[in-house]
């Protein structure tokens, strides 16, 4: 069964449902642009949004970006790494962040491993980040434990 039909059949009816963001790799978009556009339109009708993953590592063009209703542009980690000290990587990151914002989308930096890179990306206006510096990959049980710990730490004492 196609993903759009699965979501339509099983999604909550609540107006408070936050939806889902599906990541599509840039290479996949380029190879099957027509198909991805059709699926993106079906998903959008069910509260599902698209994030373009690994942006900059593939062969996308402005016409590719123009034709997709994406909400996140995820910068490939190869550009994020050492963007605080590498002028070329910094220029690419800044350009991608600006591009995301011009499309009214969020810029997400992948592979943040140093505090210097995090600071540089923050100054550039990057909206979100992910990587080992922020939180390493972890099993579901550890993630749920981390959420519980953060939730209990944020509650005021009675």
Residue ranges and their predicted role:
Residues 1, 19-34, 46-158:
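EAL-family c-di-GMP phosphodiesterase catalytic domain
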Residues 12-17, 43-46:
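Short helix-capping segments at alpha-helix termini
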């Amino acid at each position: 069964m196609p993903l759009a039909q699965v979501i339509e059949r099983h999604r909550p009816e609540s107006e408070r449902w936050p939806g889902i963001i599906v990541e599509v790799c840039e290479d996949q978009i380029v190879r099957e642009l027509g198909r991805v556009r059709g699926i993106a339109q079906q998903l959008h009708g069910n509260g599902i949004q698209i994030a373009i993953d690994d942006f900059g590592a593939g062969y996308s063009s402005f016409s590719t970006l123009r034709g997709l209703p994406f909400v996140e542009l995820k910068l490939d980690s190869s550009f994020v790494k050492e963007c605080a000290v590498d002028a070329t990587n910094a220029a690419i990151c800044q350009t991608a962040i600006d591009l995301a914002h011009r499309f009214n989308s969020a810029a997400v930096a992948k592979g943040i491993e140093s505090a210097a890179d995090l600071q540089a990306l923050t100054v550039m206006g990057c909206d979100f980040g992910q990587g080992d510096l922020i939180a390493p990959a972890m099993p579901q049980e550890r993630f749920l434990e981390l959420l519980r710990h953060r939730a209990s730490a944020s509650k005021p004492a009675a």
